[in-house]
Amino acid sequence: MRDLCNTDKPLFAVLTKLTYSAYLNILWLVCSLPIVTIGASTTALFYVTLKMAEDRDDGLTRMFFKAFRENFKPATKLWLILLAVGSFLAADGFVLRRMWSENIFWTLLTAVLIGAAVLYGIVLLYTFPLLARFENTTFGILKTAFLVGVRYLFCTLLMAAIYGIMGYVIVFVFTPAFLLGMGLCAMLCSFLMLRILYLIGGDPDAVHEEHDHDKN
């Protein structure tokens, strides 16, 4: 029993991460309820999970709402852009499915739409984690998300698989898994992305902290 409660044991560490994932998922769900705030809440979620991947987390709630507040405007702008593009692609897909016929024109149009949807998915995967980590313009974040997603394609596929498997489990296997949902997905993706984020820009948080210290 003493060994089971040892905080150095891998089992305890895993259970702790799962508990944190569930808590962060609740925060994310609550803060995403207005819909328009999904971008800010997702950015805040990744800010915390990336810190956790580095073992630099210090107060989940405080960190979450700090990131939510500081990134609200750029995250909301990015989210509204992505929501508009996603809605446009979904509407096109619906119309295409209803009007589709077996000829070269519709086949090519379907291929173009699928390609656009794949590119959209790549950008969507990386946009908010990048915003949680780096300061950039709206276009700069979207451009970097695309370039990183294409360059590190294996990581992109793994991240897409994580979300896909979680969605499948929730819908078809074990509905209560939604309690972990986005929190667990973000945590797993953060571990995958951490090395990539270092490669493309080092550790910007450490730079900001040093800069703030110098100003003081």
Where are these regions (language model features)?
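Helix-coil boundary and N-terminal low-complexity module in membrane systems
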Residues: 1-109, 120-216
